């Protein structure tokens, strides 16, 4: 990566980024986004508005055709080793047990050490899967598979997680449990998160900042000023309803 000037308080910055999949058809236009260390930043918008494309550009999975993506004060041109990824489908390897699936990002680069095993077990215990170390992914529920995917993404101690609607296919109760556990474990590790969702309640519960997208643009970024740590009981509070209504209005205005 190429060192460039950037504000020290920002871990990730997108500046005036535009992108097209097809020549002459602009998918994203003039995207500006800042993400600070330990920040949970949600991207929300209707299907097809460009949320996933922004996430891929921010992660170096796509290259901006205009503007720049700055990661840790360096111009980003490819995904980095201190980035982690969780997508909607956990994509666990069925022939490996749960523990080996979590250790896979390390095993692809070097031999597994005792400290790696301890860390993998601690992450799985934190995700409520201490009894599943040696089980196979096919024996797990959808929520449990998502927990394994999160542990796998955290095993390399990334500075940021890129998450693309990771809980969209889960039932409401499981989704809320995972949201709560994700916030807790990432707060412990001081991990930043860029999180794509179409769910207003999810964005308000998780996000410190929420950017509203429509038609390939970020139209608004709202600060969600709710107490930390977040608790499930908060979902029924007047403050939560206030920010949910504010976010819904922002989405309706730009639709």
Residue spans for each PLM region:
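ABC-type ATPase nucleotide-binding domains, specifically the catalytic core motifs of the NBD
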Residues: 22-23, 63, 96, 100-116, ...
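The feature captures the beta-strand-to-loop junction immediately N-terminal to the Walker
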Residues: 44-46
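Helix-to-loop junction immediately C-terminal to a conserved catalytic motif
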Residues: 59
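Conserved ABC transporter NBD signature motif
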Residues: 67-79
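Conserved ABC ATPase signature
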Residues: 136-140, 144
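Hydrophobic anchor residue at the start of the ABC signature
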Residues: 150
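A short, proline-enriched helix->beta-strand linker immediately N-terminal to the Walker B motif
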Residues: 155-159
């Amino acid at each position: 990566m190429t060192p460039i000037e950037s504000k020290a308080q920002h871990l990730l910055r997108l500046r005036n980024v535009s992108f097209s999949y097809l020549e002459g058809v602009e998918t994203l236009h003039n995207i500006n986004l800042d993400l600070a260390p330990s920040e949970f930043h949600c991207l929300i918008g209707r299907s097809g508005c460009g949320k996933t494309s922004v996430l891929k550009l921010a992660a170096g999975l796509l290259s901006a055709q205009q503007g720049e993506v700055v990661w840790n004060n360096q111009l980003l041109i490819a995904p980095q080793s201190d980035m982690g990824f969780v997508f909607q489908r956990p994509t666990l390897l069925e022939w490996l047990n749960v523990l080996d699936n979590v250790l896979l990002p390390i095993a692809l680069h070097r031999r597994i050490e005792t400290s790696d095993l301890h860390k993998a077990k601690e992450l799985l215990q934190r995700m409520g899967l201490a009894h599943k170390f040696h089980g196979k992914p096919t024996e797990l529920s959808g929520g449990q598979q998502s927990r394994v995917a999160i542990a796998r993404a955290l095993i390399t101690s990334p500075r940021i997680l890129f998450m693309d609607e990771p809980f969209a296919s889960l039932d409401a109760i499981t989704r809320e449990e995972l949201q709560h556990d994700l916030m807790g474990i990432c707060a412990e590790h001081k991990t930043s998160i860029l999180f794509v969702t179409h769910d207003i309640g999810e964005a308000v519960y998780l996000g410190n900042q929420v950017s509203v997208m429509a038609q390939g643009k970020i139209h608004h970024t709202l600060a969600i000023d709710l107490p930390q740590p977040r608790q499930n009981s908060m979902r029924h509070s007047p403050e939560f309803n206030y920010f949910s209504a504010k976010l819904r209005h922002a989405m309706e205005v730009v639709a």
